[in-house]
Amino acid sequence: MDILTKEELKENSLEKEKFFEELIYIFKYEGQIRELILDYKFNEKSYMYKTFVNFLLKNKKIFENIKKYDKIIPVPISKKRYKERGYNQSLLIAKEISMQISYETNNNIKLELVNNCLIKTKNIIEQSKLNKEDRQHNIQGVYTLKNGSILTNKSILLIDDIYTTGSTVNECCRVLQQAKPNKIGVLVLAKD
C-alpha cells in the first residue's frame, strides 16, 4: 500500500506532466494479485469488486485519504468493451467505495459517484497490448468532458483498476482538469 505524489511518479515516467496530485494503491501488480485482477477484469468475475474495496478501505491511511474527496469518477470504458464484458470494472469499484464511505461515516461524508462527466468517445487498441511509448499515443483524445461544471472547485478521485504506465489515468485527469477542480487524485487496486 502506498500513496505517491505526482513528483514521485514523474521520476519513472515518460510523461512530462502529471495532471493529478496523488496515486493511491493497495497492491503491487504481481503474482496472485495480478491473476485475481485479470480474472476480475476479463473472466466474468465481477463479484470480486467487493473484496477489493474491502481491502482498500480496511487500510486506515487509505480510508482517511479517500474521505477528503467530494466526487468519485470511474475511468469509462467504450460501449464495445462494455458489451463484451458486461460491466465496467472501475465503475463497480467506485460505486462500492462511495456507498461504504457513506455507510462507515453514518452519512456524514458523501463521496458522490459521478458517472456521466467523463466519456470515452473512441474504441482503441487495448492498452495492455501495447508498449509504454505506444500507450501514450493510443490514449490521446479518447475522452471528453460533459457537464463539467459539477466538478468545478471540487476534489475528484478517479478510479481505475491497474496503474501500469499511467497513460490512461493521466489522460483522463488532463480532460477532467478542464472543469477546474480543486484537486484530482487517482486510486487504483494495483500499481505495476
Regions found by a protein language model. Name each.
Residues 1-192:
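Glycine-rich phosphate/pyrophosphate-handling loop used in enzymes and phosphotransfer proteins
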